[in-house]
Amino acid sequence: VASRRPWGGSALVSELGKKFVECDDDGNETVVGTDVLVGESWELADMGSEDSVIENGWLAGNTISEVMETYLERIVGEKVYNYYGRQFPLLIKFLDINDKLSVQVHPDDAVAAERYDQLGKAEIWYVMDAKPGAKIYSGFTREITAQEFYDRCRNCTIDQVLNVIEPKKGDVLFITPGTVHAVDGNIQLVEIQESSDLTFRLYDWGREKNPMTARPIHLEEAIDLIDYLPYDTCKYRKGPLWGEDASYEPCCSHNDHCCDHEHDHEHHAHEGQTVETLVESAQFTVSKLNLTDPLHIYTEQFGSFI
């Protein structure tokens, strides 16, 4: 599923080789070219009107939601099914960002369920590529008040208090609900998140002031969702390109208590392959497998899906 964005680019087509087809109201199909700004490619989605379709095998042609309706806990495991129900719990995307991604925030599960009858949105970003000068904004450099945040969004100075990260290929960022975040520059990401599209746009770098580029701003709606404390460095994992400064602990948050003591998260073998834990959270665990040979995983031994 392709998604046009004003900050998108052409890398999903030209570099990843993705093929997107759009249909007009008459059913005519057109292949999306490199002149179209595609910001997102939804690789695995169970989002109602936007569902992934199985490409091959004996279930080819079925959507993920149809398979979930039929096989229930056999797909995701009993524990996950009991919590998430019939919706596949993860949404996986590729992002191609070539301009400024709006300053935004996502709610947690409790708020999302109470106000919108949806899941919240915890997510991770894995940096596939980042050009020199690219920036990720995540959290604040110091504690601020809701009033200061509101005023700075209105007078276009919010970037002065946002924590700035200069990402490198292989870095991992864990964006917890309530964390204000944005991007500036040329960067390609893998995004793994809960199955939710609840995003509250807080500031759009001036685009909101131009009738040609204006998109809805949700500042008042989201003001009580924001974590106004300084950025939690446990949420950022520097990849191998940082050399001696690289991190080998998984991303987490202090609330998850996985940064307060030693863990056995070094590289470990799984059937002879190298596995690294990138993120540990209540919503998901994400690992990186460095494969040199075919890998066979017997899912019956796990209580969840792989």
Predicted regions: what they are:
Residues 290-306:
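A conserved acidic, glycine/proline-rich C-terminal tail/linker
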Residues 248-270:
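Histidine-centered metal-binding segments
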Residues 123-125, 182-206:
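A short hydrophobic beta-strand segment most commonly corresponding to one strand
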Residues 103-106, 166-185, 192-194:
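Conserved metal-binding segment of the jelly-roll/cupin
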Residues 274-290:
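C-terminal accessory segment of soluble enzyme catalytic cores
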Residues 144-174:
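Active-site glycine-rich loop that binds ribose-phosphate moieties when present
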Residues 1-144, 204-251, 267, 286:
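Transition-metal
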